[in-house]
Structures are given as C-alpha cells and as structure tokens.
Amino acid sequence: KPPQPPILSPTDLSQVKPEQISAEYEKAVQELFPTDGWTVPIKLGDSLLKLVEVGAIDLEKFKKLYESRGGLSEEQLRILTEPSDEEITINFENSNFLLNILWPLGLANKNPVLEESPMNGPLVSRFASSGGWILGKDNDGGVYFNKFEIIRLTPEEQTIAQYVAENTYRPCCGNPTSFPDCNHGAALLGLIELGASEGLTQEQLFDISLKFNSFWFPETYLEIALFYKLKQGIDWPKVNPEEAMGYNFSSGPGWLTYVRPEIDKIRHFLPQEGNGTSCGV
C-alpha cells in the first residue's frame, strides 16, 4: 500500500531570493554535518570480531582494499581485532569505513527481518548487498546471508528493530531497510539491530538512521533539508526523523516525486558538489 503523500505548503521556491537560498544552504551544511560528526549511543562490542571469526570479514582483504585509500587507522584496525566499548562516531573521514563494516553485519546476522525478506531464497546472491560483498573469505557474500547469531534481540527489541527497518528508506532505490538489497540497506539494518540490542528506542533509532544516511548520501539530504526549510518552513533540527526517513523523502521514488521538482527550481543557485554515492565496497 503506497504511503499517504505529504502535505506540501504553497510556497513557490522559484520566488525565494538567491541570498536566502545561499544562507540556508550554508546553515544546512552545518546542521547535517557538524565538524566533529555525530557520536551516537551505539557500541560495536564484539560484533566485528565475530564477523571475522566466521569469515564474513576477511581481515587481509579488508586491509588490502584500504591500502589504496591511505590505509586503515590504528583505531579502525583495533575495532576489527578487539571488542569496542566506545560509542560510534560518524564523519566524512570514516563514513565509508562504517558502511563497509556495518554492511556484513546486516547481511550475516540471523534475524527474522532477513528471514522474511524477499531476498531470502535460492537467488540471494544476485543482489548488490549479497553478491557484492566480496570482502569475506568466500567471494560470494550470499553464503553469509542470515547465517550467524551475532546480535541477539529480545522480542521487545525485535519489534522495535523490525518497525524501524520497515519504515526507513535510502535514496538509491525504493526499498525499505527490511529489504536490504544494497550495501546501504544492509549497513543500516546492522546498525538498527545493534542499537535495538543496546536498548535504544524507536525514536532514537530513526534519529540515528537519519544521521548515518545523511553522511552516506550527503547531497540528497542537503536537498531534503532545504526542501523542509524553504518549502515547508521547518528547520532541520525540528524535522521529524521518522518522516524524513520514510518513503516520501528518503526513498529514490519519493525524493524524485516530492523533493527534486522543488529543488530543481533553485538548483542553479546551489553549489555543485558532484559527490556520487556507490553501492559497492
């Protein structure tokens, strides 16, 4: 069943003054991407060690990939080889690394979300999140799909994780996190399951999902923030994360329907960043 369309204000963005657009753009950059990034109340614990132990992460392949990107930092190596009791911080320097460690977690962790997913079946390896995961011992990431009990959830925690997964989307497609057919979906699922296992509420998980998606799809969320401010009159800190992460704004089709046509009216006043997002390692 398609979601209800959003109620849009009658504001015509083509009438907004260029100086206001520029000022709101700069403000949105600061609000979405603080200098130190976002630190969230989720810890990796021993989840990555378990992924290495079962072969879902091949440490040598992982190191080799990052050699061409300047190498892994001491801290990054540490969280791949030791339990981590530190809260996760996401920023532009580590957003790709976090994507690549959370991806196999969401892919390999045994959970009803994956059990009930359209991915579950003989063709599981045909999806970008499974077949595209080549940093395990086996080059076919599909062999790790829904296989290991890495994060255990109580029935209450499962209900929370399931609800958030079913109601969060990503701009590269029209599927919810509960259908994690690409790396961003699998990574967000892993993060949501971790957070739920550590006692976070639905509200916290929607907020954290929005923060991570913003760093993974920066241009898209800058435009969503501008849409909220210039079209709807809502400052980014006051935006409802559950609404912003929903189909109407965070899915590819929703964004194309509601956000892009409005932003296209002012696009010539916006900086052209050209920061594309890929669904591979």
PLM-predicted stretches and their roles:
Residues K1-A23:
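N-terminal, intrinsically disordered, polar/charged segments of Gram-positive cell-envelope systems
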Residues R170-P171, P180, A186-L189, E193-V281:
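A cross-kingdom marker for long, charged
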